[in-house]
Curated annotation (Swiss-Prot):
Membrane topology (UniProt): Multi-pass membrane protein
Name the record gives this protein: Photosystem II reaction center protein Z
TM segment ranges: 5-25, 38-58
GO cellular component terms given for this protein: chloroplast thylakoid membrane; photosystem II reaction center
Keyword Repeat: no
Similarity field: Belongs to the PsbZ family.
UniProt xrefs under InterPro entries: PSII_PsbZ, PSII_PsbZ_sf
Keywords: Chloroplast, Membrane, Photosynthesis, Photosystem II, Plastid, Reaction center, Thylakoid, Transmembrane, Transmembrane helix
Coiled coil: none
GO BP terms: photosynthesis; photosystem II stabilization
Assembly and interaction partners: PSII is composed of 1 copy each of membrane proteins PsbA, PsbB, PsbC, PsbD, PsbE, PsbF, PsbH, PsbI, PsbJ, PsbK, PsbL, PsbM, PsbT, PsbX, PsbY, PsbZ, Psb30/Ycf12, at least 3 peripheral proteins of the oxygen-evolving complex and a large number of cofactors. It forms dimeric complexes.
């Protein structure tokens, strides 16, 4: 389970690393898609917290 969560985290991170600089470099694109990036950032932070909790629980067992 943790491996799948980490893989998802890697894919979201790769997507953000590629798309955010492109959106910032393209005139007007950041304003148009700011809410989408905000949701992606929130998902990324949430996933980090879920992975930390899952790892803590699995190591305590």
């Amino acid at each position: 389970m943790i491996t799948a969560l980490v893989a998802l985290l890697v894919f979201i991170s790769l997507g953000l690393v590629i798309t955010v600089p492109v959106a910032l470099a393209t005139p007007g694109e950041w304003e148009a898609s700011k809410s989408t990036f905000t949701r992606a950032f929130q998902a990324w932070v949430g996933l980090v917290i879920v992975i930390a909790a899952a790892d803590g629980i699995s190591s305590a067992i």
